[in-house]
From Swiss-Prot:
Active site: E91, C340
Descriptive protein name: Probable dual-specificity RNA methyltransferase RlmN
Enzyme Commission code(s) on record: 2.1.1.192
Any single GO CC term annotated in Swiss-Prot or TrEMBL for this entry: cytoplasm
Organism: Streptococcus pyogenes serotype M1
The organism's taxonomic lineage, starting at the top: Bacteria, Bacillati, Bacillota, Bacilli, Lactobacillales
Highest taxon, organism lineage: Bacteria
S-S bridge residues: C104-C340
HAMAP family: RNA_methyltr_RlmN
Keyword terms, alphabetized: 4Fe-4S, Cytoplasm, Disulfide bond, Iron, Iron-sulfur, Metal-binding, Methyltransferase, rRNA processing, S-adenosyl-L-methionine, Transferase, tRNA processing
Cofactor note: Binds 1 [4Fe-4S] cluster. The cluster is coordinated with 3 cysteines and an exchangeable S-adenosyl-L-methionine.
Amino acid sequence: MKPSIYSLTRDELIAWAVERGQKQFRATQIWDWLYKKRVQSFEEMTNISKDFVSILNDSFCVNPLKQRVVQESADGTVKYLFELPDGMLIETVLMRQHYGHSVCVTTQVGCNIGCTFCASGLIKKQRDLNSGEITAQIMLVQKYFDDRKQGERVSHVVVMGIGEPFDNYKNVMCFLRVINDDNGLAIGARHITVSTSGLAHKIRDFANEGVQVNLAVSLHAPNNDLRSSIMRVNRSFPLEKLFSAIEYYIEKTNRRVTFEYIMLNEVNDSIKQAQELADLTKTIRKLSYVNLIPYNPVSEHDQYSRSPKERVLAFYDVLKKNGVNCVVRQEHGTDIDAACGQLRSKTMKKDREKVTATK
């Protein structure tokens, strides 16, 4: 299976071309075709010789993804189900915001983190996506904009789809360099957010990268007992280890950390738990932010339900009274398969039923 050329950073593409007897400017031309003109085949690169186009075709594909399902919400949110070359399925979501167009990308096929409320982990991790497969998600959403011819562009990226980004660290970092490159898509680092469930050692590595990309941490509980019961990752990286790494990140980068907190009715949404959360973040209050997230119910996790609005607001009020920077997140795509991993899970179930029916 040929890798996608999207897997290469600009420097790597230059090195690859020079090794094959080409001048550096040839790689720059190819890069422009990929990320500025956004062609979908090497044959469209009209200033590249046929011989070198043949070498490109022998070495790479362009976009490795095939579109399987598209769901569009009344609010303009678009959810894509893409098929990988090996037949595996992944999800990507386009969210229209007042500040621009944000795309949520997937980094793994399945997830091993094992959060008990999440649809992503219904199917265990089967493999990591390579950086080209992650970048290809952005390119196909941008193609959707290009085809509309309204001058729209992907302006923001959130690495919050299926999988744990820091469990696929090398490929995610390569992806970030590709989409942030000023000579390509030029998506600003401060418009990119990477979310982790709390791999403390990788948070430290990320701090040392020196990038301006935003960090979000999926917290979802204010104490170890509850967090370990709903997020298995907490057994390896309890809150003490996690917050030590977060404090290191803040000290090293002087950048704010966002905490994501899904509101689960009568599980993590009490007044007492709001106070615990306020106390937990007290020492980093100036450089932290809490995002309260309405829960999208998942049929396979019917032990959980969405917190009523009055409980969310009461929780929010406690945080605000304690000086915590916080917001209740705006919902997107509530009339489609909104929960992360939900569309993929449903489609795989339908595919299995079709196979069974033909036997």
